[in-house]
């Protein structure tokens, strides 16, 4: 089973640590964390990331704007937004910014895990998927 690199972006340290702890129980994930949109943007430029989980309310810029910047820079992997605001308008803004999914806090971990796996499966089947064989990336 391939290991998928997930970047978790949230300024709430306790939530970030709890999610990393839960996801680390599964051998299928390699986990990294960031506290801001700026850190996330730099991270996805420097490293291969298979999926980003990104909070909307980040200290340096709105998470949706961070996603927009990542997409403009060519980031193709799935992005799941986390938000405390569940309005339809908020969801539309996130999806239009380039997010693939929207999860409203509080959420059940099992639901987030199922969405992560579904987006990874879908992305692997798409033309945008990146494959590594030894030192080569395709």
Regions found by a protein language model. Give the residues of each.
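Short, Lys/Arg-enriched segments at the junction into DNA-binding effector domains
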Residues: 5, 118-138
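Two-component/phosphorelay signaling modules centered on CheY-like receiver
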Residues: 13-32
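Acidic, metal-coordinating helix/loop segments flanking the phosphotransfer/catalytic sites
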Residues: 33-51
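Acidic catalytic/metal-coordinating carboxylates
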Residues: 36, 62-65
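Short amphipathic alpha-helix used as the core "switch/output" element in two-component signaling
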Residues: 42, 64-75
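Active-site residues of response regulator receiver
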Residues: 55, 83
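The feature encodes the CheY-like receiver
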Residues: 59-62, 87
